[in-house]
């Protein structure tokens, strides 16, 4: 019997069970937990390979018979729900049908009945590549239309947030007419969008038009007034119409302190933006909401991970972001009250212990949209370096539990908080085929390929006038799925059910499908996969030190991070 060494097998078919792969230049190792492949019957495409008629392709098995539209074979899958496994990914009608062993069951062993390949099946070999779900940014300020291009190039396939462009402070898509224009503009990109309206009203009637107009949820922001009456009203409407409320609390504590806000919330579910506080929120103790079972906490990437530059860059960013005047002492005090090294350091640890469940960008509202994914992995690597391997790890040398915890922050948990996890957030069967392929050396920073709705929309591409598409310069460029009517067919907009019932898509002439969110009002912190910790968090009002279950949370800022200047020129 012919044999291969592990090294030879990995070079031809990708790593198998027990092998480990380093993620970029981080300290993280992903160890293969299970391999769906059947040795000797692996799928490979190309000259002299197995995916030929009568071999890996089943003769006469066409689309109507269930043949896959697209096969991604021999992929190392990193998924918060499925785990870290090796297998073939089957795509049909823009959705994932199964993960397992693909091919021709007439001559191959172990072929999954839904992963049969035929003449209609296009193939992307993924041996040596990592596949993840498309990223979800839960905290976007749409101040610039061009951020969509940066998002796709970074591996984000769903953007949720507000703003209408370069207005004074871009917070939300308030107003039925305004959100309609954003939905019409969203037709231009192969990206899923969810637009947030303005929840700052103590009168419930004024909120419903935004939901009928196409908003996914509502956002309460301190710049419009985050008073207890506003919070209570918005949550009452949310409970009736099933949408998520995002809360950016009152930094100045003018309308009440944290205790007053929590009293207004009661035991109702709410999505807490800026859990750490540098981006906004009750100073200095907003971070304690990460220990509440009904508060779903997220934070944003400017403070993650904590570095020697974090404190200095935030003061200027806050002044610009919130339309503050550096010549007005009260405005300067507002900015300075937000930036606390103690809570920023604690934020890193609360992410690592799973107490903060989600990480978004706060794009152009102090964050950077192209750094959602890379900063998540920078933080995970920093925490491994400073805190060691997690005690709950079960593999021989991998960091799988930590990896699953961190990828969940911008995939499945980001989807669950908005009630859209039945559509996106993982590579589970039945979900939209939104996925990203990475070369391990570039994992988390530069994707190799972005697949949206089962079709390639962005990819590393060489000179198009050259003889091969691998000829330099290699640049991330839009591909066929990003043009014509394909971009609308491959993506969706997430809305409240009122917009679907009002047939808003027809009224606005939209080609993108509108999909309703549901199940947001029964969520608890326990629904946040790998990130459901609820420690008792206390902030010392004098020193700003943060304590979780009585233990002081502290970590040092770092002067170097992975996935940085080794890859980028800035």
From Swiss-Prot:
Its GO biological process annotations read: urea catabolic process
Record's PROSITE patterns?
UREASE_2 (PS00145), UREASE_3 (PS51368)
The pathway is: Nitrogen metabolism; urea degradation; CO(2) and NH(3) from urea (urease route): step 1/1
Gene Ontology terms, MF aspect = nickel cation binding; urease activity
Give the EC number. 3.5.1.5
* Class in the EC hierarchy, top level: hydrolase
Residues annotated to bind Ni(2+) 1: 139, 141, 219, 362
Q: Which UniProt keywords apply?
A: Cytoplasm, Hydrolase, Metal-binding, Nickel
Q: What protein does this entry describe?
A: Urease subunit alpha 1
Species the sequence originates in: Pseudomonas syringae pv. syringae (strain B728a)
């Amino acid at each position: 019997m012919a044999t291969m060494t592990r090294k030879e097998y990995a070079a031809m078919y990708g790593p198998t069970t027990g092998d480990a792969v380093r993620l970029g230049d981080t300290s993280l190792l992903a160890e293969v937990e299970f391999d769906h492949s059947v040795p000797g019957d692996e799928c490979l495409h190309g000259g002299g390979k197995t995916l030929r008629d009568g071999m890996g392709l089943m003769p006469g098995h066409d689309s109507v018979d269930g043949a896959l539209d697209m096969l991604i074979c021999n992929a190392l899958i990193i998924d918060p729900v499925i785990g870290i496994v090796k297998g073939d990914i089957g795509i049909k009608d823009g959705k994932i049908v199964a993960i397992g062993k693909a091919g021709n069951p007439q001559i191959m062993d172990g072929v999954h009945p839904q992963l049969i390949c035929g003449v209609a099946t296009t193939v992307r070999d993924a041996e040596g590549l990592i596949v993840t779900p498309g990223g979800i940014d839960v905290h976007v300020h749409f101040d610039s239309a061009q951020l969509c291009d940066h998002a796709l190039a970074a591996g984000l396939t769903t953007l949720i947030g507000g703003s209408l462009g370069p207005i004074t402070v871009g917070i939300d898509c308030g107003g039925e007419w305004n959100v309609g224009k954003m939905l019409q503009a969203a037709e231009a990109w192969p990206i899923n969008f969810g637009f947030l309206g303005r929840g700052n009203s103590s009168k419930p009637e004024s909120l419903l038009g935004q939901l009928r107009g196409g908003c996914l949820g509502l956002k309460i922001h301190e710049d419009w007034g985050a008073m207890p009456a506003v919070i209570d009203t918005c949550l009452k409407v949310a409970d009736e119409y099933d949408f998520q409320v995002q809360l950016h609390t009152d930094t100045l504590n003018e309308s009440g302190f944290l205790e007053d806000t929590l009293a207004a919330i009661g035991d109702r579910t709410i999505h807490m933006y800026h859990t750490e506080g540098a981006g906004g929120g009750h100073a200095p103790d907003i971070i304690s909401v990460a220990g509440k079972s009904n508060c779903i906490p997220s934070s944003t990437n400017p403070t993650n991970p904590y570095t020697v530059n974090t404190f200095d860059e935030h003061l200027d960013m806050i002044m610009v972001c919130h339309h503050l005047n550096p010549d007005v002492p009260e405005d300067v005090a507002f900015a300075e009250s937000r930036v606390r090294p103690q809570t920023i350091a604690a934020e890193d640890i609360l992410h690592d212990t799973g107490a903060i469940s989600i990480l978004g960008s706060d794009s152009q509202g102090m964050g950077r949209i192209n750094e959602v994914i890379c900063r998540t992995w920078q933080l995970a690597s920093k925490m491994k370096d400073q805190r060691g391997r997690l005690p709950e790890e079960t593999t021989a040398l991998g960091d799988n539990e930590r990896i699953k915890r961190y990828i969940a922050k911008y995939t499945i948990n980001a989807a669950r908080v908005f009630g859209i996890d039945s559509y996106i957030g993982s590579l589970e069967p039945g979900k939209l085929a939104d996925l990203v392929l990475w070369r391990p050396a570039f994992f988390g920073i530069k994707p190799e390929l972005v697949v949206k709705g089962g079709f390639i929309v962005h990819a590393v591409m060489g000179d198009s006038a050259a003889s091969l598409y691998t000829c330099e310069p290699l640049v991330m460029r839009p591909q066929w799925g990003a043009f014509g009517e394909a971009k609308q067919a491959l993506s969706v907009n997430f809305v409240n059910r009122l917009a679907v019932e009002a047939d808003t898509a027809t009224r606005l002439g939209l080609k993108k499908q509108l999909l309703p969110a549901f199940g947001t009002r029964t969520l608890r912190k326990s629904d946040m996969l790998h990130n459901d910790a609820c420690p008792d968090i206390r902030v010392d009002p004098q020193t700003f030190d943060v304590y979780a279950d009585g233990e002081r949370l502290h970590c040092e800022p770092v002067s170097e991070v992975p996935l940085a200047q080794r890859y980028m020129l800035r």
